[in-house]
């Protein structure tokens, strides 16, 4: 009798742990979706300040020691490239978060199901 109770407690503890990890990775996945949909919203503040406006990019460029003197048009092209790269990087991070969530669920779901069935079987006995 005591052995079955111990096994049942073990099974429920594993289920609770799986649920906790699943909830954490669900949050990571939701944040990943937000990063994909609106990368400007989730990008780091210090990185966004560099590329948010052309003027801020130009000011940073001019402050850089040893920076090549470029025309406004050349600077604008570099600014657009840098902004696009920052946004693409944020979207890529979002895709990685989503992938991590899916991998976690692929691993956790069978563990949860096995232990949930074990706990139910032990409870019925």
At which residue positions do the language-model features occur?
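Alpha-helical rod/repeat scaffolding segments in eukaryotic adaptors/tethers
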Residues: 12, 16-19, 23, 43, ...
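Intrinsically disordered, low-complexity regions enriched in Ser/Pro/Gly/Gln/His and often acidic
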Residues: 16-19, 54, 72, 109
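N-terminal membrane-entry
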Residues: 93-107
């Amino acid at each position: 009798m005591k052995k079955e109770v111990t096994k049942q407690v073990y099974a429920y503890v594993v289920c609770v742990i799986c649920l906790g990890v699943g909830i954490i990775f669900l949050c990571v996945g939701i944040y990943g979706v937000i990063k994909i949909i609106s990368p400007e919203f989730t990008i780091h503040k210090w990185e966004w300040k560099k590329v948010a406006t052309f003027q801020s990019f130009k000011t940073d460029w001019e402050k850089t020691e040893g920076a090549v003197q470029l025309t406004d048009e050349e600077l604008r092209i570099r600014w657009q490239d840098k902004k696009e790269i920052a946004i693409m990087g944020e979207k890529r991070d979002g895709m990685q978060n989503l992938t991590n969530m899916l991998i976690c669920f692929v691993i956790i779901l069978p563990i949860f199901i096995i232990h949930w069935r074990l706990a139910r079987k032990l409870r019925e006995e």
